[in-house]
Amino acid sequence: MKPSERRKARRLAVQAIYSWQLSGNNIADVEHEFLTEQDVAGVDIAYFRELLGGVATKKSQLDELITPFVTRPLDEVDPVEKAIVRIATYELTFRKDVPYKVAINEAIELAKAFGAEDGHKFVNGILDKLVARNK
């Protein structure tokens, strides 16, 4: 498994979680849709599935971890940035094999690619505070 395969899995997971958040569709249906309708060449499919399923099943727990560091209600946070923060929080909490610097850097890069103009600063701020609290 190459790092680029995980990066592609994260990119696809952001898009899938964004879709799930907005549509309210069953996560299994969202997963199936993305795996059949998107280009998944070079994607770590197992990691994509873990991120998608993990964020969906642990959403409440992840949101409880995130909420203290957000200055507005979570439902007012940009859905792309919320998806990115949820993925990174999942990695920071449940994937101890992923160094926290990697999880944060990947989230920042995803926010630069998909988020609002200063979305990466928002994402970085939340994740830095989350890591500092959990050290």
UniProtKB/Swiss-Prot annotation:
Q: Which UniProt keywords apply?
A: RNA-binding, Transcription, Transcription antitermination, Transcription regulation
The entry's protein name is Transcription antitermination protein NusB
Gene Ontology molecular functions = RNA binding
Query: What does it do?
Result: Involved in transcription antitermination. Required for transcription of ribosomal RNA (rRNA) genes. Binds specifically to the boxA antiterminator sequence of the ribosomal RNA (rrn) operons.
- Tell me the protein family, please: Belongs to the NusB family.
The record's annotation in Pfam families points to: NusB
One Gene Ontology BP term is: DNA-templated transcription termination
Which InterPro entries does the protein's record reference?
A: NusB-like_sf (IPR035926), NusB_fam (IPR011605), NusB_RsmB_TIM44 (IPR006027)
GO cellular component terms, alphabetically, are: cytosol
Concerning NCBIfam families, the annotation shows:
nusB
| Designated gene of the protein | nusB
Tell me what organism the protein belongs to. Answer: Shewanella pealeana (strain ATCC 700345 / ANG-SQ1)
